[in-house]
Amino acid sequence: MWKLYVAALPANGWNWIAVWRRNYLAWKKVALASILGNLADPLIYLFGLGAGLGMMVGRVDGVSYIAFLSAGMVATSAMTASTFETIYATFARMRAQRTWEAILHTQVTIGDIVLGELAWAATKASLAGTGIGVVAATLGYTEWVSLLYALPVIALTGLAFASLAMIVTALAPSYEYFIFYQTLVITPMLFLSGAVFPVNQLPGAFQHVTRILPLAHSIDVIRPIMLGSPLVHVGLHIGALCCYAVVPFFLSTALLRRRLMP
């Protein structure tokens, strides 16, 4: 098992850039449609819940509900963009298009490919999260400088969720299995992590579950930054996101090597 992990590591510190660039060049042809697609869902939540439910809710934690919600949607947009890129587009490149098979005939290793795919998913997550943030800043729900401070956390959020989704990609026999991850993990996480309402409104048992969810850690950093509130336990939240980004990377890489190169 140890040899499997070692063999799955990236060959060096730069091969992954070629994988990232390949994905970027392919994406550039459909960039506008891709960006609009990633923004549509969070914007519907933002204006649908924010404008409609916000009239009944009023203020939450001292700010308007739509301002509270906008910060949650920034993190959620990063989560969904990186997750869908990894479980669908990455799986297509690995299985249907057989792009990985062609790449593996070069000096690039499985680890290089996975690292490049994760970096690309984090890039798309950054674009999606920043897009929602730009809308929020334009409408006055956050300051522009606050959005700039939030960008590294948005990117880290994308990297963490891409890394987690890569495990699903490594194990899934076909596209149909991804619906289980979407409905049983991603969707519940949206409502349990404080994206649409405060976590302290949840029952006690659910609040304990929330503490281990990566989206909750992301929101607990992004929301205070965007709303100008004090940051609490920021080191813990960033450390948790780093763990979610790093540990699944090694696990998924080993699983993919065993799957593709038995």
From Swiss-Prot:
PROSITE patterns: ABC_TM2
Molecular function terms, GO-annotated: ABC-type transporter activity
GO process annotations (BP): oligosaccharide transport
Compartment list: Cell inner membrane
Chief subcellular location: membrane
GO CC annotation, single: ATP-binding cassette (ABC) transporter complex
InterPro entries linked: ABC2_TM, ABC2_TM_bact-type, ABC_2_transport, ABC_transptNodJ, Nod_factor_ABC_transporter
Keywords: Cell inner membrane, Cell membrane, Membrane, Nodulation, Plasmid, Transmembrane, Transmembrane helix, Transport
TM ranges: 35-55, 62-82, 102-122, 127-147, 148-168, 177-197, 231-251
Keyword Lipid metabolism in annotation: no
UniProt membrane topology term: Multi-pass membrane protein
Claim: Membrane is one of the keywords in the record: yes
Domain of life, per lineage: Bacteria
Domain ABC transmembrane type-2: 33-259
Summary of subunit composition and partner proteins: The complex is composed of two ATP-binding proteins (NodI) and two transmembrane proteins (NodJ).
Family, similarity comment: Belongs to the ABC-2 integral membrane protein family. Lipooligosaccharide exporter (TC 3.A.1.102) subfamily.
Function: Part of the ABC transporter complex NodIJ involved in the export of the nodulation factors (Nod factors), the bacterial signal molecules that induce symbiosis and subsequent nodulation induction. Nod factors are LCO (lipo-chitin oligosaccharide), a modified beta-1,4-linked N-acetylglucosamine oligosaccharide. This subunit encodes the transporter.
Protein name according to UniProt: Nodulation protein J
Species per Swiss-Prot/TrEMBL record: Rhizobium meliloti (strain 1021)
Name of encoding gene: nodJ
